[in-house]
Amino acid sequence: MVKAYKQAGVDIEAGYQAVALMKQHVQKTMRPEVLGGIGGFGGLFDLSSLDYRQPVLVSGTDGVGTKLKLAFLLDRHNTIGIDCVAMCVNDIVVQGAEPLFFLDYIACGKAVPEKIAAIVKGVADGCVEAGCALIGGETAEMPGMYAEDEYDLAGFVVGIAEKERLVTGQTIQAGDVLIGLPSSGLHSNGYSLVRRIIFEQAKLSLDEIYEPLDVPLGEELLKPTRIYAKLLRSVLGRFTIKGMAHITGGGFIENIPRMLPQGLGVRIQRGSWPVLPIFDFLRAKGNLEEEEMFSVFNMGIGLVLAVSPETAAPLVQWLDEQNEPAYIIGEVVEGAGVSFTGGNEA
């Protein structure tokens, strides 16, 4: 029967080998609360030792999107898992949660053990960076659904927060200040547009270094998404943060309003932070308008915090002392949506 299954395109032995190879990576993510190891029907996590009066579990799920296509083209698979963790974890930490555990899902056309292990290594590296345990996952070999050299990657994270310390945005008011934390690059959104610009419009090579970039284009595009979990935990332990927005799909235009109460908008100050060269490069090659850039990309800001005016300067100063750049990028105003003021167009 196993032989027949292999002839149908599913190699069970390859799956076993992949699990054996990934165990070393999974092990480094373990926390004391994890019960048992991988391989069970479900992952176990003991909450009893955590010191919360009114604990609230906060969950998130996401994938990497078409950034995967570039990993396929470059045959580089050891960092794409970091992106998967980041996309999930950043969504829950902006609500004040501490990530506890993570699960991944890999669907592929052909299970190549070394490739699967490389993907999981990235997931494990992301979990270590976020402080959460990788307690389970699924690798599904699906011939006929995916090409042999392609796969999809998704993840699921659960975190915890004290109910009274959830960051909900409800206390945000006009006059509050917006602080931006830098991104590492494109992060994990906008890649369908990126691929269209690079391959169809500009017909560029992933192996070439183009001005103003300082690394090959492919390397720039595969830079892992920044994970903000540990930094935000330190921030939340010292400062009152009224609201936070993870700048992902939809850019500034869609994501910043998600943290605002009804009747409020934001005014962004152009030129108040350094826009990374990759964004200027893509805008020029794709002939894109400012509004579209801010509707698709993070433009060099991966996370936005809303704080009271008296908190803004001390927070930026403290972050600077931690060698963590931060920028006052705008303010909350009466109205709705996102507007821009000052300087030249980004």
Swiss-Prot record:
GO molecular function ontology, one term from the record: phosphoribosylamine-glycine ligase activity
Subcellular locations according to the entry: Cytoplasm
A matching Pfam family: AIRS_C
Keyword ATP-binding carried by entry: yes
InterPro entries referenced in this protein's UniProt entry, alphabetically: PurM-like_C_dom, PurM-like_C_sf, PurM-like_N, PurM-like_N_sf, PurM_cligase
Top-level taxonomic group: Bacteria
Pathway(s): Purine metabolism; IMP biosynthesis via de novo pathway; 5-amino-1-(5-phospho-D-ribosyl)imidazole from N(2)-formyl-N(1)-(5-phospho-D-ribosyl)glycinamide: step 2/2
Enzyme Commission number, as recorded: 6.3.3.1
A Gene Ontology biological process term: 'de novo' IMP biosynthetic process
Membrane-crossing residue ranges in chain numbering: none
Gene Ontology cellular component list: cytosol
Enzymatic class: ligase
Reactions mediated catalytically: 2-formamido-N(1)-(5-O-phospho-beta-D-ribosyl)acetamidine + ATP = 5-amino-1-(5-phospho-beta-D-ribosyl)imidazole + ADP + phosphate + H(+)
Keywords (A to Z) from UniProt: ATP-binding, Cytoplasm, Ligase, Nucleotide-binding, Purine biosynthesis
Family: Belongs to the AIR synthase family.
Protein name, per record: Phosphoribosylformylglycinamidine cyclo-ligase
Species annotation: Geobacillus thermodenitrificans (strain NG80-2)
Classification of source organism: Bacteria, Bacillati, Bacillota, Bacilli, Bacillales
